Amino acid sequence: TSAGGGGLTNLGMSPFIGTLLGRVGPGVLHRLDRITDLVTRVRRVGRPIEDALVDRYSFDSPVSDALVRFAADMIFGTSFDAMGDFVPAIESMDERESLTAFRGTEVVVINGMGDLLTPPSHSETIVDLIPGAEHVVVEDAGHLIMLEHPELVTQQIRMAIERGQMARHENVAVERKPRVRRRITDIARRRQVERAKERVR
């Protein structure tokens, strides 16, 4: 995730791409919204390309075709008009000052090592601004980490809740805790992937 401050629309490439998308993207998207029927027909024909792009920018480990299609339908179910408004809004977003509201609260920031849209450096900014926050970076995980590794994400959230309850019970100031950054591998998920590869062989 990201608190903003620029560089959110470069698709993991370069600042030049981000600037180009920020300038040209909204206009193109608003125009596409006027020819929705044509775009829908093109999407049907170009589904393999659409799925490949969604897979590339959403996940960093092999996932099922059904999950890729679910993510694609969710993303492209948004109107192009809304996307056109979204691009400049997210480029100008800067919520770093708002993070002070989380001070004194148990916070865990989770993101994927392979997230091309909001890489770990974006999350590190959040962690640096919230004393005592924990940063969990998951190997083999992309931008849609909550769909790619649902059990692991749920586990980390539950652990954060338990830490918060324990800190309150023991009267420990959360903001005095040292910052923790952990890199985690979802072993269960990795084994599933390996078994699937073996079945294909």
Model-derived features: where do they sit?
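Short alpha-helix in the alpha/beta-hydrolase fold that links the catalytic acid
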Residues: 88, 105, 119-128
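Proline-centered loop/turn at the N-terminus of a beta-strand
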Residues: 105-106, 134
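Flexible "cap/lid" loop of the alpha/beta hydrolase fold
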Residues: 1-38
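Conserved alpha/beta-hydrolase catalytic His-Asp/Glu region
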Residues: 33-101
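Acidic catalytic loop of the alpha/beta-hydrolase fold
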Residues: 90, 113-118
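Catalytic active-site module of serine/aspartate enzymes centered on a nucleophile-bearing elbow/loop
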Residues: 124, 130-201
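Short beta-strand/loop motif that positions the catalytic acidic residue
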Residues: 102-103, 109-111, 115
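Residue-level signal for the nucleotide or nucleotide-sugar donor/cofactor binding architecture
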Residues: 78, 118, 148
